[in-house]
Amino acid sequence: DIAGATQELERAVLDGCRGAFVAPFTLSSKSHGHPDHDALWGKAQELDVPIAIHPMAEPGPITRGNRFRDLGNDASWYYNVLARQGIQQAFYSFFQYGVFDRFPRFKLVVLEAGAGWIGASLDRMDAVRDSMADGKQSLPLKELPSTYFRRQCWISADLAQVGDPLCHRGIIEG
C-alpha cells in the first residue's frame, strides 16, 4: 500500500523520526525500484529523510529463489547465509529503474547485510553498464552506478567482520 506507506512516512517524520526502513521484499512482487513505488521515494526526498533496506523474516514463497531441489526448509544455515541476496536484489532494483535520476536527492541505506560485497558489486554494475552503452541496454542511468552510490547511498559495516574493514578503508580513504 504505497499511499498508506507514504502517509505513514510523513506522520512518522512529523513525530520526530529521521528515516524509515523497508523489508527486502514486497508483497506485490514488484521490485523496490519499480515506478509504482515512486510516491514513497518522492516523499522521502521531499522530507529529506533516508530510506533503508533492512533484513527481516520473509514469507516462505518469497524467500525461495532456490536453484536446488534438495535444499528444503531444514536448510536454515544455507538460507541465512544467503539472506543478504534479498537486500542486494532490492538495492539493485533502484538502479535498474533509474530511481536516483528521478529523485536526485533521495537517500538509500543498506543495513545489516555486511559491506564486503559492495566494492565488487559496484565494479560489476559499472562494467555491465559500460558494456551495454550501445543503446541496447535496459539500464536507464545517466551516470555510472558507483557515482549514484557515492552521492546517494550508504551501507552499514561491521568492522568485526572479515571483509568489512577492507571495504571501509577503500570507501572512506579511497
List each model region and its residues.
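Catalytic pocket-lining loop regions of alpha/beta-barrel enzymes
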Residues: 2-4, 9-174
